[in-house]
Amino acid sequence: MYVKRGFYFNILGGSFMEKWTDKVIVAVHYEDTNDPRRVIEKVKVEDDDGDSLKNKVVMLRKSVVADIENNISYVTAYKDDDGKYKEGKKVIIDIVNGVKYIKTEKNDKTEDNLDKLEEF
């Protein structure tokens, strides 16, 4: 497999597969589901190798924050009707009142928000 301008070229298949990011968040677990702030405790993450998502692991929220601060990129992903993951949005850190939240969009809310990912 070769990398060329952000794409992976599969020598055997001769097709281009776009790499979304370094890591993909596919599910979330909230600290307290009754808390309206919705703070994530941990996430299920897979590596994006350009052809598929691999190596599913559970990571603590603080590890995701540290990775993003160290320039490791994340996006969300959702399963379609065929059970295949589709790329969601880029995950960012949004600091509100001095607290770092992981979100897909900046806003003034004191909560994590990765849209409507599967919960575990």
Where are these regions (language model features)?
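Short, Lys/Arg-enriched N-terminal segments with co-localized hydrophobic residues
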Residues: 1-16
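Short, compact, well-ordered microdomains
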Residues: 80-120
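Short, surface-exposed binding/anchoring microloops in extracellular/periplasmic proteins
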Residues: 17-45
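A broad, low-specificity signal marking well-ordered, structured residues that form hydrophobic/aromatic
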Residues: 23, 74, 100
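Positively charged, low-complexity intrinsically disordered regions
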Residues: 6, 38-39, 62
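Acidic, aromatic-enriched beta-alpha/helix-loop junctions
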Residues: 43-92
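A generic structural signal for short, non-catalytic loop/turn and secondary-structure boundary residues
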Residues: 2, 18, 69, 84-86, ...
